[in-house]
């Protein structure tokens, strides 16, 4: 067997599941190419999508690559379908706009071999340096999130750090606690990890197991928020805040600072908007806890407060206008009465 061939005679140790909509073919190609360059060879690649990407057909001319057609509407549904068809004892998830270094699977396999009780392993996802300035979300996340990617975290404290674009599970845990929640359009990875932690499974965030992630910016910032809101505002989620409260509060306070500056110069309803700032700022904690802080934490409270400012300003102006009109009307009426009474009979 040649060095770069995959051992197809064995059952693969790892199944890499790559769920995609097929709308980012350039990124998808780079992701697949990065997986084919792995130094670890006993693995399979499963691409799950609604439609086969014909433009990349040549990349699938390999026995260790499979394409699965899945018509579900969520990422969770696609990944579940991949897990159910996976042959490996470990299943790794990577996003279609991410790229793995050549030793990514080697490090994953070695870590699971070193810690037999480990059930969930994740690592950081860094924005490529040449893209970090293309949108403010990438820049801000690069400064703040990556600063927290140098330590190893375990179990419940690891949940806030592990992202769905770079995570590996033992396949057996899906049979034990169920599959990913297919109703959620976002946060489904963290919801699954929360269930693992609550059932006593071992989780680990390892800064050495990283991928590059080409982030999509503002256009996906609020995707799926309405269906996921009941989850990340639930009491169970709130209880887990204590495991990473200061990490979450850091982002919330950043949000509060921005909104505070704005309301000081815009709205006469200072104390009302201070309350709203606190409310939506600390919703940022939930955003952090559900792994969506990279898209919402810096903008969510800002958008809401600007909207609130406009609403308050509108009603404030409307009330003032109404009061002015009423005052004018009464003034005219009083003036008419006064003029009538002052006329000689």
PLM-predicted stretches and their roles:
Residues 181-185, 190-241:
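Catalytic donor/gating beta->alpha subdomain of glycosyltransferases that bind UDP-sugars
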Residues 70-86:
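Glycine-rich, basic loop-to-helix element that forms the pyrophosphate-binding segment
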Residues 103-136:
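Conserved donor NDP-sugar-binding/catalytic core segment of glycosyltransferases
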Residues 1-34:
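N-proximal low-complexity "stem/linker" segments adjacent to membrane-targeting elements
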Residues 123-124, 141-159:
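Short, flexible, basic/aromatic active-site loop/helix in glycosyltransferases
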Residues 150-169, 185, 220, 242-243:
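A recurrent flexible, glycine/aromatic-enriched loop bordering the glycosyltransferase active site
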Residues 91:
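Short aromatic/hydrophobic "clamp" motif used to bind/position activated sugar donors
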Residues 33-42:
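Short, acidic, metal-binding catalytic loop of nucleotide-sugar glycosyltransferases
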């Amino acid at each position: 067997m040649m060095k770069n061939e995959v051992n197809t005679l064995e059952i693969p140790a790892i199944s890499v599941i790559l769920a995609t909509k097929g709308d980012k073919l350039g990124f998808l190609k780079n992701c697949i190419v990065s997986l084919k360059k792995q130094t670890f060879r006993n693995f399979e690649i499963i691409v799950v999508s609604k439609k086969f990407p014909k433009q990349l057909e040549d990349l699938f001319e390999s026995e260790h690559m499979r394409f699965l057609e899945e018509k579900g509407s969520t990422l969770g549904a696609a990944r579940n379908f991949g897990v159910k068809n996976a042959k490996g004892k470990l299943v790794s998830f990577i996003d279609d706009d991410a790229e793995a270094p050549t030793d990514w699977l080697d490090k994953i396999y070695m870590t699971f071999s070193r810690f037999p009780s480990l059930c969930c392993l994740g690592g950081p996802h860094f924005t490529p340096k040449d893209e970090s300035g293309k949108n403010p979300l990438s820049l801000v996340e690069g400064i703040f999130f990556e600063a927290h990617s140098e330590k190893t975290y375990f179990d419940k404290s690891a949940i806030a750090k592990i992202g769905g674009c770079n995570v590996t599970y033992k396949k057996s845990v899906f049979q034990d606690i169920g599959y990913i929640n297919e109703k959620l359009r976002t946060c489904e990875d963290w919801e699954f990890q929360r269930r693992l932690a609550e059932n006593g499974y071992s989780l680990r965030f390892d800064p050495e197991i990283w991928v590059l992630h080409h982030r999509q910016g503002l256009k996906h910032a609020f995707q799926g928020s309405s269906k996921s809101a009941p989850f990340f505002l639930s009491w169970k989620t709130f209880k887990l805040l204590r495991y990473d409260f200061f990490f979450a509060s850091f982002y919330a306070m950043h949000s509060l600072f921005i909104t505070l500056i704005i309301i000081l110069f815009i709205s006469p309803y200072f104390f009302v908007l201070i309350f709203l700032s606190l409310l939506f700022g600390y919703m940022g904690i939930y955003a952090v806890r559900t792994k969506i802080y990279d898209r919402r934490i810096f903008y969510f409270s800002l958008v809401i407060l600007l909207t609130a400012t406009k609403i308050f300003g509108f009603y404030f102006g409307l009330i003032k206008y109404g009061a002015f009109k009423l005052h004018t009307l009464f003034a005219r009426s009083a003036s008419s009465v006064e003029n009538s009474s002052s006329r000689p009979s």
